[in-house]
């Protein structure tokens, strides 16, 4: 039974997205449907966590907009994600970057991999 589930999940996993890690700055193109119209909206920020794995994998992106911290959690394999681009590779030593929530200004930056 477990093999059947894994087989079905393997078929549905997206392979068109680039690989990224926690600490990277990513730009996500999100499909937004307003009535009959559909448009793309960009959301750029730092990946602060990746959870689960396989088909149910999610990741959380944090950005500061107009002085207010905004976090959005996206399912990695969801069709609402039209595109994902890694803007900057970050160098971190943690899997979850919750400490960035308490930092302000330059202290909230992640070092870049050279």
Curated annotation (Swiss-Prot):
InterPro entries: Ribosomal_bL19, Ribosomal_bL19_CS, Ribosomal_bL19_sf, Translation_prot_SH3-like_sf. GO terms for molecular function: structural constituent of ribosome. Disulfide bonds: none annotated. One of its GO terms (cellular component) is cytosolic large ribosomal subunit. Keywords: Ribonucleoprotein, Ribosomal protein. It holds the Pfam family Ribosomal_L19. One of its GO terms (biological process) is translation. SUPFAM superfamilies: Translation proteins SH3-like domain. This protein is located at the 30S-50S ribosomal subunit interface and may play a role in the structure and function of the aminoacyl-tRNA binding site. This is Large ribosomal subunit protein bL19. The gene is rplS.
């Amino acid at each position: 039974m477990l093999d059947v589930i894994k087989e079905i999940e393997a078929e549905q996993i997206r392979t068109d997205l680039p690989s990224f890690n926690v600490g990277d700055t990513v730009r996500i193109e999100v499909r937004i449907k307003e009535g009959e119209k559909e448009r793309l909206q960009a959301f750029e920020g730092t990946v602060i966590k990746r959870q689960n794995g396989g088909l149910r994998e999610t990741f959380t992106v944090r950005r500061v907009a107009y002085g207010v911290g905004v976090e959005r959690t996206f399912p990695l394999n969801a069709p609402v994600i039209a595109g994902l681009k890694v803007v900057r590779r970050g160098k971190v030593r943690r899997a979850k970057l919750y400490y960035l929530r308490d930092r302000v200004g330059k202290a909230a930056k992640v070092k870049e991999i050279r």
